[in-house]
UniProtKB/Swiss-Prot annotation:
GO MF term list: heparin binding
Span of the signal peptide: 1-19
Organism: Mus musculus (Mouse)
Bias type Basic residues, positions: 203-228
Biological processes per GO annotation: nail development; positive regulation of Wnt signaling pathway; Wnt signaling pathway
Domain (TSP type-1) ranges: 138-197
FU repeats: from-to residues: 85-128
Name by which UniProt lists this protein: R-spondin-4
Length: 228
């Protein structure tokens, strides 16, 4: 009796160990059974509901699919946050990575990136950047111009501080091209060095006011002594 019973116990233990090994193998390969960050999870299909702030990424292999909860969606997918769930959605067919369904960040081979779109070729007036395959406008900035007069409240005179500005134009690299190029400008703080007509320097005005107050005090003293 003991021999068949021991054999039966060993067989049951072997079955349990085999099932445990399969579960560990599935979790290690990223297929079903990886329930990290899940609210609802199954060994066969993985996660179906994720914890808050995580994205549900569903990977399909043939007719089977496996869910996984991730902090960031993998390359070729972008995250969509919703009231019920956050999901990873696949980018467009020509996008390698994207910010949304309508805005690509990097295109697949043989496509060129222009204003978030992946195009077969760059539009007229643009050139392809060799490393990024981005379409860039053919503009070369000219040297900076001279600084403008220092202006405060629309005036070039006064006291205190104002702003001075300089500009440079970004013209087409080739004169025959008609790319739309922008004007660049920058401003910086500057001191107003010239007083407006009829205006006194605040420092001189303060000194004059102090002198007048001092003179009035001196005038009062003899009057006060005489009244005593």
């Amino acid at each position: 009796m003991r021999a068949p019973l021991c054999l039966l116990l060993l067989l049951a233990h072997a079955v349990d160990m085999l099932a445990l090994y399969r579960r560990k193998k599935q979790a290690g390969t990223g297929l079903g059974g990886n329930c990290t960050g899940c609210v609802i999870c199954s060994e066969e299909n993985g996660c179906s509901t994720c914890q808050q702030r995580l994205f549900l990424f569903i990977r399909r292999e043939g007719i089977r699919q496996y869910g996984k909860c991730v902090h960031d969606c993998p390359l070729g997918f972008f995250g969509i946050r919703g009231q019920e769930a956050n999901r990873c959605k696949k980018c467009g067919a020509t996008c390698e990575s994207c910010f949304s369904q309508d805005f690509c960040i990097r295109c697949k081979r043989r496509f060129h990136l222009y204003k978030g779109k992946c195009l077969p070729s760059c539009p007229p007036g643009t050139l392809t950047h060799q490393s990024t395959r981005e379409c860039q406008e053919e503009c070369e900035p000219s040297p900076w111009g001279s600084w403008s007069p220092c202006i405060h409240n629309g005036k070039t005179c006064g006291s205190g501080w104002g702003l001075e500005t300089r500009v440079r134009e970004a013209g087409p690299a080739k004169q025959e091209e008609t790319a739309s190029c922008r004007v660049l400008s920058e401003s910086r703080k500057c001191p107003i060095k010239r007083l407006c007509p009829g205006e006194r320097n605040p420092r001189q005005k303060n000194r004059k006011d102090r002198r007048q107050r001092k003179d009035r005090k001196l005038e009062r003293r003899p009057h006060q002594r005489g009244s005593q």
